[in-house]
Amino acid sequence: MASPEMEERLRKIIVDQLGVDEAQVVPSASFTKDLNADSLDLVELIMSIEEEFGVEIPDEDAEKIQTVADALQYLETHQSNE
């Protein structure tokens, strides 16, 4: 399970990058369907996540990150391996 600090950091990135209300950023929220992100938004979001958390997300993994929960799970898995 992701730490509250990790969730808060991710939530801030999503709010800043996508210009959405913080209340909309829930684990089940789809970046494209619920938060209205387009493909450019997603690229910028992934880049911001990489920078904030010090991880590199390959394109094939980035394509699988569709929801807030997906992003948290990815970060949890890949930060613990460092």
UniProtKB/Swiss-Prot annotation:
It is found in: Cytoplasm. GO terms for biological process: lipid A biosynthetic process. Its main location: cytoplasm. GO terms for molecular function: acyl binding; acyl carrier activity. Pathway: Lipid metabolism; fatty acid biosynthesis. Residues 4-79 form the Carrier domain. The keyword rRNA-binding does not apply. The modification O-(pantetheine 4'-phosphoryl)serine is found at residue 39. One of its GO terms (cellular component) is membrane. Keywords: Cytoplasm, Fatty acid biosynthesis, Fatty acid metabolism, Lipid biosynthesis, Lipid metabolism, Phosphopantetheine, Phosphoprotein. 4'-phosphopantetheine is transferred from CoA to a specific serine of apo-ACP by AcpS. This modification is essential for activity because fatty acids are bound in thioester linkage to the sulfhydryl of the prosthetic group. InterPro entries: ACP (IPR003231), ACP-like_sf (IPR036736), PP-bd_ACP (IPR009081), Ppantetheine_attach_site (IPR006162). Carrier of the growing fatty acid chain in fatty acid biosynthesis. Belongs to the acyl carrier protein (ACP) family. This is Acyl carrier protein. It comes from Chloroflexus aggregans (strain MD-66 / DSM 9485). The gene is acpP.
